[in-house]
Curated annotation (Swiss-Prot):
Self-association state and partner proteins as the record states: Heterotetramer of one alpha, one beta, one delta and one gamma chain.
Annotated InterPro entries: PFOR_II, Pyruvate:ferred/Flavod_OxRd, Pyruvate_synthase_PorA, Pyrv_Fd/Flavodoxin_OxRdtase_N, THDP-binding, Transketo_C/PFOR_II
Domain of life where this protein originates: Archaea
One Gene Ontology term of the molecular function aspect: pyruvate synthase activity
EC number annotated for this UniProt entry: 1.2.7.1
PANTHER family noted in UniProt: PYRUVATE-FLAVODOXIN OXIDOREDUCTASE-RELATED
GO BP terms: response to oxidative stress
Stated name of the protein: Pyruvate synthase subunit PorA
SUPFAM superfamilies in the record: Thiamin diphosphate-binding fold (THDP-binding), TK C-terminal domain-like
Keywords: Oxidoreductase
Residue ranges crossing the lipid bilayer per the database entry: none
Length: 395
């Protein structure tokens, strides 16, 4: 029977890893995700998880260790955040290029400088081009569920790509919420044994992995990574459908909330989706035709789902805790690319909010709504990007 309890998202991630039964875990502690490997090391030490826990001297070594273990043919897991993920950057490309279905938990935290240990999405958003599938959790239950789903998708032979699951620093990592721990037997049936055919250590079947590719072959290798990410779209939908049947919880790449008659729809990710939905309820009571959408899958980018959502809106706004310096927020950039060839598309606005753990308030969302209403009234967007909640007296 499932166990209903309360726990932090870090603990939920550790429980998900335990349920998935990885054989090798390597990690280096970093705020705010330190509790994830700590809890897993307890499971291993207590004999609750039959796995090798490798203590390393850096995050670069942690990801390198799980790359080696995955290349040897076993299920692996790691966790990190912020500068730790940035330090892993070099090896993330290697994991994807070698087609290793590693799963990693990310306690989404801002990047230095200045040093900041609080939440935004800059760390994982900055890895969007590495070839890793990316999921984002709204709450602690989703942190657990999405890690299980990450294994299901990553290990599918049509995909064979690594995956990361992000959940907001402190807002989720250190906050206790109700969580249902699934039954181990059901998880075993859902995931099955990891039996790779492409990468495993066998003296009778010697292979070379991570080898040099000349110009005559390199481009095709990269194409196959891109193609696998494209195939992951269907696999994710299939995994979501099976997960709902087995566990009773429904997931979608983009989850819509009160969008059917909305003129203005705001899109976000992570725990901010909860705030946004509560704010939409308040605005609906005040008579505003506003809706919300939560993006659970960021890579592969949900192109068709964004196009379907855009057809419902007159104004599509993105509330995001990241910034691509030199242009706009990354989610807005990707959504704009997804809609570029559409004959009809809504007015689009980007709102940068909550960087470095700053609270995103109803007042800030009211500011975003005011800007969206002005664009709707004028029928054009004069300025696509707006920083909301900015303390102008400090500039």
């Amino acid at each position: 029977m499932p166990i209903r309890t309360v726990m932090k998202a870090n603990e939920a991630a550790a429980w998900a890893a335990k349920l998935a039964k990885p054989k090798v875990i390597a990690a280096f502690p970093i705020t705010p995700s330190t509790l994830v490997p700590e809890k897993i090391s307890e499971f291993v030490a207590n004999g609750e998880l039959d796995a090798e826990f490798i203590k390393v001297e850096s995050e670069h070594s942690a990801i390198s260790a799980v790359v080696g273990a995955s290349a040897a043919g076993v299920r692996t897991f790691t966790a990190t955040a912020s500068q730790g993920l940035a330090l892993m950057h070099e090896v993330l490309f290697i994991a994807a290029g070698m087609r290793l279905p590693i799963v990693m938990a990310i306690g989404n935290r801002s990047l230095s400088a200045p040093i900041n240990i609080w939440n935004d999405w800059q760390d994982s958003i900055s890895q969007r081009d590495t070839g890793w599938i990316q999921f984002y959790a709204e709450n602690n239950q989703e942190a657990l569920d999405l890690i299980l789903l990450a294994y299901k998708v990553a290990e599918d032979e049509r995909v064979l790509l690594p995956a990361m699951v992000g959940f907001d620093a402190f807002i989720l990592t250190h906050t206790v919420e109700p969580v249902e721990i699934p039954d181990q037997e059901v998880v075993d049936e859902f995931l099955g044994e990891y039996e790779p055919k492409h990468a495993y250590l066998d003296p009778k079947r010697p292979i070379t992995q991570g080898t040099l590719a000349f110009p005559a072959h390199y481009m095709e290798a990269k194409y196959l990574v891109w193609d696998a990410m494209e195939k992951a779209r269907k696999v994710i939908d299939e995994a979501f459908a099976e997960f709902e049947k087995r566990f009773g919880r429904k997931y979608q790449k983009i989850e819509e909330y009160k969008t059917d008659d909305a003129e203005i729809i705001f899109v976000t990710m992570g725990s901010l989706a909860g705030t946004l939905k509560d704010w939409v309820d308040k605005k609906r009571e005040e008579g505003y035709k506003v809706g919300a959408a939560k993006m659970t899958v960021y890579r592969p980018f949900p192109v068709e789902e964004i196009r379907a959502l855009a057809k419902k809106a007159k104004v599509l706004g993105f509330i995001e805790k990241d910034i691509s310096i030199g242009l706009y927020g990354a989610v807005f950039i990707d959504a704009s690319a997804a809609l570029v060839n559409e004959s009809e598309r809504p007015l689009m606005l980007d709102f940068i909010a909550g960087l470095g753990g700053r609270d995103v308030t109803f007042g800030q969302l009211d500011d975003a709504l005011r800007i969206a209403e002005e664009a709707l009234e004028k029928g054009e967007v004069e300025k696509p990007i707006h920083w909301i909640g900015l303390r102008k007296e400090l500039l």
